[in-house]
């Protein structure tokens, strides 16, 4: 569901399925875990690496908007879809070239032991993975926050207008390039959250990008 939020964000802004979201999850997780290793002697490796990774994902959104999306304004949806496919392959290759292809363990303090719920309702209770429970809670919070963002904020309403009709949105003064920069930045941050949750559960490896298929 965390990966699905990234799909929804891009779809709402462009009406196009973002094939690169899984690659963004992997790239964000790889960047975080490798920066944590490089900063392991600092006072707070996770916090510093997290802030740097956020900056990297926002910079990535800027590069994507400037080099790819800007030239595809008012182009058919299939062109945008093919662009996201290309972005996916570039991110996979770039991530492997920069950070390597090993499997990395990511420990962010999420408990590994399962939790027993509803013992008073079901005999023996229901066994739930702590990591899955944390992921569900985070996904619920993000859905609520993004719902308010799309419905109540000026930028959110502009995003919906852009998704409906790029040309009409531009004709009323909505800056399409800025909107795409915002939505890809937010999608990158959602990918980072998904990468942290799934990376702590499965390890940070190149198959992590396949979690997008579960969305």
Language-model regions: role of each:
Residues 11-20, 59-104, 149-161, 213:
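Short loop segments and helix-boundary regions at transmembrane helix junctions
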Residues 13-63, 67:
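Membrane-embedded helix boundary and interhelical linker motif in transport proteins
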Residues 23, 27, 46-55, 81-83, ...:
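Hydrophobic alpha-helical transmembrane segments
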Residues 29-33, 54-60, 85-94, 138-147, ...:
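Hydrophobic core segments of alpha-helical transmembrane domains in multi-pass membrane transport
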Residues 25, 101-117:
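Peri-membrane helix termini and adjoining interfacial loops of integral membrane proteins
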């Amino acid at each position: 569901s965390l990966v699905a939020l990234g799909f929804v964000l891009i779809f709402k802004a462009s009406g196009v399925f973002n094939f690169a979201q899984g690659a963004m999850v992997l790239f964000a997780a790889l960047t975080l875990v490798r920066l944590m290793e490089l900063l392991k002697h600092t006072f707070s490796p996770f916090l510093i690496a997290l802030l740097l990774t956020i900056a990297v994902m926002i910079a990535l959104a800027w590069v994507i908007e400037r080099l790819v999306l800007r030239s595809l304004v008012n182009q058919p949806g299939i062109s945008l879809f093919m662009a996201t496919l290309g972005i996916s392959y570039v991110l996979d290759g770039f991530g492997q070239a920069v950070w390597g292809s090993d499997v990395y363990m990511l420990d962010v303090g999420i408990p590994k032991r399962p939790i027993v719920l509803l013992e008073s309702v079901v005999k023996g209770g229901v066994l739930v993975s702590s990591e899955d429970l944390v992921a569900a809670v985070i996904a619920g919070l993000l859905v609520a926050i993004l719902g308010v963002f799309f419905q109540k904020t000026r930028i959110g309403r502009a995003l919906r207008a852009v998704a409906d009709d790029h040309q009409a949105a531009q004709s009323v003064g909505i800056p399409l390039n800025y909107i795409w920069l915002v939505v890809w930045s937010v999608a990158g941050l959602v990918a980072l959250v998904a990468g942290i949750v799934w990376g702590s559960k499965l390890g940070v490896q190149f198959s992590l990008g396949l979690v997008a298929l579960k969305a």
